A protein has these predicted regions:
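Extreme N-terminal tail/first-helix region
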Residues: 1-38
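Short coil/turn segments at secondary-structure boundaries
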Residues: 33-36, 136-140
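Short, structured beta-strand-loop surface elements
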Residues: 4-8, 77-132, 138-142, 150-152
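Short beta-strand segments
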Residues: 42-79
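Extracellular/periplasmic catalytic domains that process cell-envelope and extracellular macromolecules
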Residues: 39, 66-67, 138-139
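Short beta-strand micro-motifs in enzyme catalytic cores
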Residues: 46, 144-146
């Protein structure tokens, strides 16, 4: 499974968020001020570690999440850009991921929700972070909703 690390290729505010999350072992960084991205307050975030599809290196990104039936749900919005985020491309190539939610760390298998499940999860996630709706309006691609199914021993 991929390991967590501070990303080098992302903006400084994301690097700082991940560094705080990791250095505090999840005691800080879990709640994030979403106003920087158009939100209206603090939102819970997780860290997702994927394996780079070309490099094979671990890649870590913080993401807003929701919980449904013991699984975690994230949105591959990339702010509504025309391309999917790299982390999503990575997990479609290798769905085995590592997840940190506050102080809880676990392995999971990522899958893209489809059909009715996607619609229900999209509604839940856009209720948590309403800017997702604006992101969807500004792109021609359907923004993926990803379910992180924890691996049980």
């Amino acid at each position: 499974m991929p390991e967590f690390s501070v990303p080098t290729q992302l903006p400084d505010w994301i690097k700082d968020h991940v560094a705080l999350y990791l250095e505090s072992e999840g005691k800080e960084g879990h709640m994030w001020d979403s106003s920087i991205a158009g939100g209206s307050g603090s939102l819970a975030t997780l860290l997702l570690a994927t394996t780079g599809r070309r490099s094979g290196d671990s890649r870590t990104v913080p993401l807003i999440y929701g919980e449904v039936d013991g699984n975690y749900v994230v949105v591959a919005s990339r702010g509504g850009s025309k391309d999917h985020p790299d982390w999503y491309k990575n997990l479609t190539a290798n769905p085995d991921v590592s997840v940190r939610v506050a102080t809880n760390v676990f392995d999971a298998v990522a899958r893209t929700a489809e059909g009715d499940e996607r619609e229900a999860l999209w509604q839940k996630m856009s209720d948590i972070f309403p800017p997702y709706n604006a992101y969807q309006e500004r792109t021609d691609r359907q923004i993926p909703v990803v379910v992180l199914d924890p691996v049980t021993a």
